[in-house]
Amino acid sequence: MTMESGAENQQSGDAAVTEAENQQMTVQAQPQIATLAQVSMPAAHATSSAPTVTLVQLPNGQTVQVHGVIQAAQPSVIQSPQVQTVQISTIAESEDSQESVDSVTDSQKRREILSRRPSYRKILNDLSSDAPGVPRIEEEKSEEETSAPAITTVTVPTPIYQTSSGQYIAITQGGAIQLANNGTDGVQGLQTLTMTNAAATQPGTTILQYAQTTDGQQILVPSNQVVVQAASGDVQTYQIRTAPTSTIAPGVVMASSPALPTQPAEEAARKREVRLMKNREAARECRRKKKEYVKCLENRVAVLENQNKTLIEELKALKDLYCHKSD
């Protein structure tokens, strides 16, 4: 019992000493703890972890376990402003996409406005709608509308030709030839001259056909000639030349009179004759002047030769005279 009580007294004494030392260490460490507490304030919001245990050796040689007040540095919970940067870049991309969509919409609207403008063919049709006998040009349609073939009706006017004598010749589609004098008004009072149509023949053959006048007379003429009887009773023959189908469209007939040349050809021939006549006159005058000049030169040479002979004779006479005086 005595040993047990002694041990208890010793343990109680050691405990009292330990408590006193702990109090002294606590008093000495208060400024540091306060400082550490001040330093560790920003990390108060960090996640809780187990406190670190530090072994402290006292001056009397005892070792005490002290719970560390300074906590380990925790990873910062402050997020970097990358999220905001990503947000800004996303907004910029969305604005670019919106601008591209707007540009595509504007280009589509511009194409629609251009497609609504009237084409040149439509303007030409509007201008030529009032002119009689002018075929209308169908406006180009889209591919959807061109599925069905469009048929255009073209009205071909009756060709009317005027000869150099003042007569009018109208050739209808049926093959009839109508004649009118210069005094008639328009197409009224035309004399109809019907010609029988000949069948297709080989090239190089001559076809004769009957031409019936208004008074009932029939005249046998070649197929490429037309006989015209004027009001005065004169009968004139006109030759009709048909050009090949490759150069002129079918239905176009060229009428010409071999006996009466056209006015431009006569004017050109007259000008050519005048030019040739002037050239001949100029050449004749040039030759005449050349002959006169040659004659003038020949006369001058003859005069100079005579003068030279005279001077030679005078020189001889002077020499003879000088020789006699010296003797």
From Swiss-Prot:
Protein's UniProt keywords contain Transcription: yes
Effect of residue 119 to A: Does not interact with TOX3 and inhibits induction of transcription by TOX3. Loss of phosphorylation by CaMK4. Loss of phosphorylation by TSSK4
Domain bZIP: 269-327
Consequence when changing residue 102 to G: Found in a patient with multiple congenital anomalies; does not affect CREB1 phosphorylation at S-119; fails to interact with CREBBP
Glycyl lysine isopeptide (Lys-Gly) (interchain with G-Cter in SUMO1) crosslink site(s): 271, 290
PTM per Swiss-Prot/TrEMBL: Stimulated by phosphorylation. Phosphorylation of both Ser-119 and Ser-128 in the SCN regulates the activity of CREB and participates in circadian rhythm generation. Phosphorylation of Ser-119 allows CREBBP binding. In liver, phosphorylation is induced by fasting or glucagon in a circadian fashion. CREBL2 positively regulates phosphorylation at Ser-119 thereby stimulating CREB1 transcriptional activity. Phosphorylated upon calcium influx by CaMK4 and CaMK2 on Ser-119. CaMK4 is much more potent than CaMK2 in activating CREB. Phosphorylated by CaMK2 on Ser-128. Sumoylated with SUMO1. Sumoylation on Lys-290, but not on Lys-271, is required for nuclear localization of this protein. Sumoylation is enhanced under hypoxia, promoting nuclear localization and stabilization.
Site (Required for binding TORCs): 300
Subcellular location: Nucleus
Gene Ontology molecular function: any one: Hsp70 protein binding
Region named Disordered: 1-26, 94-113, 125-148
Region feature (Leucine-zipper): 297-318
Sites bearing Phosphoserine, chain numbering: 119, 128, 257
Disease affiliated with this protein: Angiomatoid fibrous histiocytoma: A distinct variant of malignant fibrous histiocytoma that typically occurs in children and adolescents and is manifest by nodular subcutaneous growth. Characteristic microscopic features include lobulated sheets of histiocyte-like cells intimately associated with areas of hemorrhage and cystic pseudovascular spaces, as well as a striking cuffing of inflammatory cells, mimicking a lymph node metastasis. A CREB1 mutation has been found in a patient with multiple congenital anomalies consisting of agenesis of the corpus callosum, cerebellar hypoplasia, severe neonatal respiratory distress refractory to surfactant, thymus hypoplasia, and thyroid follicular hypoplasia.
Protein name: Cyclic AMP-responsive element-binding protein 1
Organism of provenance: Homo sapiens (Human)
